[in-house]
């Protein structure tokens, strides 16, 4: 039940006489505790935090001595006590609150420092169900919310990055300011919200609930970006803690800060190369505006890069490059010849680091792993007043999934290229048409409102690339073609045949499939249907 009672206005600067510290991450704890002690602050603590402070030869009162009640049930119950929550929630200038504190022997707690049990990290490492449950913090969030509610009098720290600001105010102003306490309270509520979001989403996954009645979202700020897609837009980069190798948890070895567009494109590039098993062949993807302008496998990583670049060397300028194997010196030399924004790879050898190091603005990201294209996950898209949530497109097809629908079946080489093309198709904005030859894209048509236009654009770009390379015929001659969705009419397929394609892969499912199949037979094309669509918007 809420109270409608009004309280006296608190002073801006609140003196800190007593602080309760209870942290899982003890980074910076001792220096912080020492500074508080030096400022005359009484320290109260729990369990391992109290032991760490005592081991540093600093005076500290155990919370059990404050409450008169021992920790119990393996530490599940230690701070859930009126002497703790009363000390955090009491309105200091309210006569009734002050009388209650005196009657029950409750001392005010002016500063709370808590970071929570590492639930997110426990889940990320793949811990068993029971271990995850034991890392759900109860007392910590309760104290944090209490202190944040009473921010008029109490400061609350949930992030060691704020230790310095608090000490600076205590030593410089004699206490914490209301401005600082409000900022800390906002951060505290955001932290508990993100923590609860992680727990609720973990539970949903554990029980196979794909559409819970309530879905919580949380994340922590990784980077404040200079701007968004355009300079007039404000932007930030938040990470959710999902244990999936990629731009969110990559190590940046060099280069300028990533921009909004860099992050978006780098994610698209690395997710694409994750489609190709590094044990089978090295692969390279070159991305511009979240669309590939070249994808290839090769005998070596450098060979794959050269083949990917040949698809559309003009668009590759200023692009993002992703590799599915460690970056080596030969590949780095090739990449360094043109302007590139970002390289992302599982690792980079010494030669590659040295070569890329000469390009001071070129960003090099190392992930120590590849995203698994088969892993389940969620994809979010904002709409006015809501969010669309769908599972990650982890659909894949293999030879046994394909249905040959034409008189001629694909050759072995055509079949390999068809499967390659359909994997790439999944990562191209719809409507998508992809021409592939010998394990490399040779023409990409993306994002057109009609499928036939995408087919024509892809063929035209292949023609342009051939002319730029001084070749008489485009690489689409003798290629295969993939479509992310069915051909609604035969025109798109006929355009591909005119460009020189010899085999087609597409989902099928059009009311005019028979017409499209007949057109393929007339042109001598082999065609397989996947039964799986790969729209991407």
Curated annotation (Swiss-Prot):
InterPro entries: AICAR_Tfase_dup_dom_sf (IPR024051), Cytidine_deaminase-like (IPR016193), MGS-like_dom (IPR011607), MGS-like_dom_sf (IPR036914), PurH-like (IPR002695)
SMART domains with a match to the protein in the record: AICARFT_IMPCHas, MGS
GO molecular function terms attached to this record: IMP cyclohydrolase activity; phosphoribosylaminoimidazolecarboxamide formyltransferase activity
MGS-like domain span: 11-158
Catalytic activities: (6R)-10-formyltetrahydrofolate + 5-amino-1-(5-phospho-beta-D-ribosyl)imidazole-4-carboxamide = 5-formamido-1-(5-phospho-D-ribosyl)imidazole-4-carboxamide + (6S)-5,6,7,8-tetrahydrofolate; IMP + H2O = 5-formamido-1-(5-phospho-D-ribosyl)imidazole-4-carboxamide
CDD domains found in the cross-reference section: IMPCH
E.C. number(s) listed in UniProt: 2.1.2.3, 3.5.4.10
Alphabetical UniProt keywords: Hydrolase, Multifunctional enzyme, Purine biosynthesis, Transferase
PROSITE patterns in the cross-refs: MGS (PS51855)
Pathway: Purine metabolism; IMP biosynthesis via de novo pathway; 5-formamido-1-(5-phospho-D-ribosyl)imidazole-4-carboxamide from 5-amino-1-(5-phospho-D-ribosyl)imidazole-4-carboxamide (10-formyl THF route): step 1/1; Purine metabolism; IMP biosynthesis via de novo pathway; IMP from 5-formamido-1-(5-phospho-D-ribosyl)imidazole-4-carboxamide: step 1/1
Superkingdom field: Bacteria
Coiled coil regions, renumbered to chain: none
GO BP annotations, alphabetical order: 'de novo' IMP biosynthetic process
Entry's free-text remark on domains: The IMP cyclohydrolase activity resides in the N-terminal region.
HAMAP family referenced in this protein's UniProt entry, alphabetically: PurH (MF_00139)
Protein known as: Bifunctional purine biosynthesis protein PurH
Organism: Parvibaculum lavamentivorans (strain DS-1 / DSM 13023 / NCIMB 13966)
